[in-house]
C-alpha cells in the first residue's frame, strides 16, 4: 500500500505584493503630512514671513554697504592737512617773491614754483588715501567772468589701483594734467589724455571747480575751507579721458581770505563699482549711488537721480534715467518702478 501525501492547494493570488502594500501605506502617510504642512504654512502665514525676512536681509545688506561707502567718502574728503600744507607753501613763495597772486593763474610758467612745491604733497595724499586721483587747480579770479575754454594751471594725478602696494618710483601713477617740465622732473608717466593745463569748461554746479571756489569767492571766504566742500552730483569725464569718475573738492584759502584755487580727490567709477558688489544681493540685484532733493527718505514718493550703478554683467556705469520709487506699503520696503513691483532699500550717505 502506498502512502500518498496530501495534495496542498495553492493560495489564490491577491495581486498585491508585501512591498507594494508597504509603499502604498508610506505614500498615504506622506500625503497626509504634506496636507498638514500646507495647512500649517497657510495658518501661520509662512509665505509672507519669508518675504519679510528677505526684505529685512536686503535692508541690512544695503545699510552695511552704505556705512562702508560712507567711511570711504569721509576719508577721501578729509583734506585739512593737505590744504594747510599747500597754503603754507603758497604763503612762503609769495613772501619770497617767487609767485604773484595777480599772475598765478595766467600760465603754468607763472604758477610753476607752486606746482613744483605742491606735487610731493599731492603724491603723498594719493598714497595714504583710498582714492584714485588727486588734483590742484589754480585760479584767483571770479569764475563768473572767466571765459569758457580758458586754460588754468593744474596738477591732476591718478592711481588706477589705490589698494595695491605703491611703487617706489611712482611707476603706478600717471599725470592727467601737469606742466611738461614737472612731468620730466618727476619722471611720472602721462595718461593718454594728458595735457599741461586744465580747460575751464564753465560747467557750473556740475563741475568740481566752480561750486567750491565760487561759493568761497562770493562769500568772502568767511567760513573754513571744508565748509565749502563739494561732491559732484553727476559723474564726469576729463576731456579726452575714458575713465568715468566723481570728485570731492574744496577751495584753497590764504589766511587773509584770498581764494586762489581748489584741491580735490577723485573716485573712479571702476573703483566704486568694486565696492558695490551686486553679487551680495539676491535675484540679480543692483546697487545705485543716487542723489535726491527729497528731504525725508521715508516719504511716500522718492525722486532719485542715479550717479553710478553697479552691473552684474561686469561693467560699471552711470544711469541717466531718473528713478521714481513709490512706497507700496507702510509696513514693507516694496516700491513700484516702471509698473513692476520691486523690493528696494534706501540708505542715506551722510557726507557733510
Go through each PLM region and give its residues.
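N-terminal Lys/Arg-rich, disordered targeting/topogenic segments
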Residues: 1-14
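Juxtamembrane extracytoplasmic/periplasmic/luminal helical "stalk" adjacent to the first N-terminal
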Residues: 12-113, 130
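Short regulatory alpha-helical segment in sensory/regulatory domains of signaling proteins that mediates
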Residues: 70, 88, 116, 120-129, ...
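Short, hydrophobic-rich beta-strand element in sensory/regulatory alpha-beta domains
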Residues: 80, 122-123, 130-141, 285-291
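Solvent-exposed, extracytoplasmic
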Residues: 117-122, 262-306
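GAF sensory/regulatory domain recognition
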Residues: 138-199, 292-296
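Extracytoplasmic/periplasmic ligand-binding sensor regions of membrane-associated signaling proteins
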Residues: 178-264
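Extracellular/periplasmic juxtamembrane segments that couple receptor/chemosensory ectodomains to their
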Residues: 242-270, 309-352
Amino acid at each position: 500500500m502506498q502512502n500518498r501525501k496530501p495534495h496542498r492547494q495553492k493560495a489564490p493570488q491577491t495581486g498585491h505584493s508585501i512591498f507594494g502594500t508597504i509603499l502604498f501605506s508610506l505614500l498615504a502617510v506622506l500625503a497626509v503630512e504634506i496636507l498638514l504642512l500646507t495647512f500649517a504654512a497657510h495658518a501661520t502665514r509662512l509665505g509672507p514671513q519669508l518675504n519679510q525676512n528677505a526684505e529685512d536681509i536686503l535692508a541690512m545688506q544695503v545699510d552695511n554697504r552704505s556705512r562702508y561707502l560712507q567711511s570711504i567718502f569721509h576719508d577721501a574728503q578729509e583734506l585739512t592737512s593737505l590744504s594747510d600744507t599747500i597754503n603754507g607753501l603758497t604763503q612762503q613763495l609769495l613772501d619770497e617773491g617767487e609767485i604773484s597772486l595777480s599772475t598765478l593763474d595766467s600760465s603754468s610758467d607763472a604758477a610753476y614754483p607752486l606746482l613744483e612745491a605742491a606735487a610731493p604733497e599731492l603724491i603723498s595724499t594719493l598714497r595714504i588715501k583710498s582714492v584714485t586721483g588727486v588734483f590742484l587747480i589754480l585760479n584767483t579770479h571770479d569764475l563768473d567772468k572767466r571765459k569758457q575754454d580758458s586754460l588754468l594751471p593744474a596738477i591732476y594725478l591718478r592711481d588706477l589701483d589705490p589698494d595695491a602696494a605703491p611703487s617706489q618710483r611712482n611707476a603706478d601713477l600717471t599725470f592727467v594734467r601737469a606742466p611738461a617740465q614737472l612731468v620730466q622732473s618727476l619722471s611720472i608717466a602721462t595718461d593718454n589724455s594728458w595735457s599741461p593745463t586744465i580747460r575751464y569748461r564753465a560747467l557750473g554746479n556740475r563741475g568740481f571747480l566752480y561750486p567750491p571756489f565760487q561759493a568761497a569767492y562770493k562769500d568772502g571766504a568767511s567760513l573754513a575751507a571744508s565748509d565749502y566742500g563739494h561732491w559732484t552730483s553727476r559723474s564726469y569725464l576729463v576731456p579726452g579721458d575714458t575713465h568715468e569718475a566723481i570728485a570731492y573738492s574744496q577751495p584753497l584759502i590764504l589766511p587773509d581770505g584770498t581764494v586762489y584755487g581748489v584741491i580735490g580727490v577723485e573716485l573712479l567709477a571702476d573703483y566704486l563699482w568694486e565696492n558695490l558688489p551686486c553679487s551680495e544681493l539676491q535675484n540679480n540685484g543692483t546697487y545705485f549711488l543716487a542723489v535726491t532733493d527729497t528731504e525725508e527718505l521715508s516719504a511716500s514718493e522718492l525722486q532719485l537721480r542715479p550717479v553710478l550703478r553697479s552691473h552684474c554683467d561686469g561693467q560699471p556705469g552711470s544711469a541717466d534715467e531718473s528713478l521714481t520709487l513709490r512706497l507700496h506699503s507702510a509696513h514693507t520696503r516694496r516700491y513700484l518702478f516702471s509698473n513692476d513691483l520691486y523690493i528696494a532699500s534706501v540708505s542715506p550717505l551722510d557726507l557733510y
